[in-house]
Amino acid sequence: LDPESPPATWDEFVAAGKKLTKKSGDSVDQWGAMIPSTGYPYWMFGALAMQNGQTLMNGDGNMTHFDKPATIEALEFWKSLGSDHGIMPEGTIEWGTLRQNFLEEKTAIMWHSTGNLTTVKKNAKFDFGVAMLPAQKRRGTPTGGGNFYIFKDTSAEEQAASLKLIKFLTQPARTGEWSMKTGYLGTGPEAYNTKALQDYVKAFPPAAVARDQLEFATAELSTYQTGRVRKMLDDAIQSALVGSKSPAEALGDAQSKADRLLKRYR
């Protein structure tokens, strides 16, 4: 394998995973890859679905696409990485311990938030790289992140103070610093025009991979009643990965539940 030529397609990802899986008898010393399926399964799945040419919801946020053929194919592929190809543990994989599994070389590849990058950089005792996620019909990744809010039922003084803090935290110099110290993206292109972040990216090119991957990004799953809808999809993904339902059955059930919840918003 050429570490400077990471897998660019699903087929290449599987092939690389097989070469990277190391066994001692019946036990696995190092898995080829791990994709977390607790914490934010819907988020990881948004990448796989988009790579297969399918979004998880419409632009109005009142209809989901969980039972579309391309969505089902994406979940079948995810499950097959463990059940058929043997490059990933079967069942669920913990979000919270995956980074440590990578640092301990229990998996050769991990799919995870770019917010782990600086911690991995500081703690990895081996050379590592960062690559864009592989494509099937196209490349795809979900966006992530959080928000600042100012509540209307607060005093004018509190609102002014909140706005002052938000303006400070969102200055290009601050978001660039935040990116370097965490691995998260700078929250605007201006951050990447600061000398500090430009110098950092020049010295550590992996810091620019997630930024460059935005070209292929889709919005993360967001609908009316988002929390409930995400839970429906999370449960469906996990039930398929552990084998209690087929991907088609699990996603069909999730779609029916989401339809009942979202029809009032159409």
Feature locations, PLM:
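Beta->alpha turn/N-cap motifs
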Residues: 95, 112-117, 134, 146
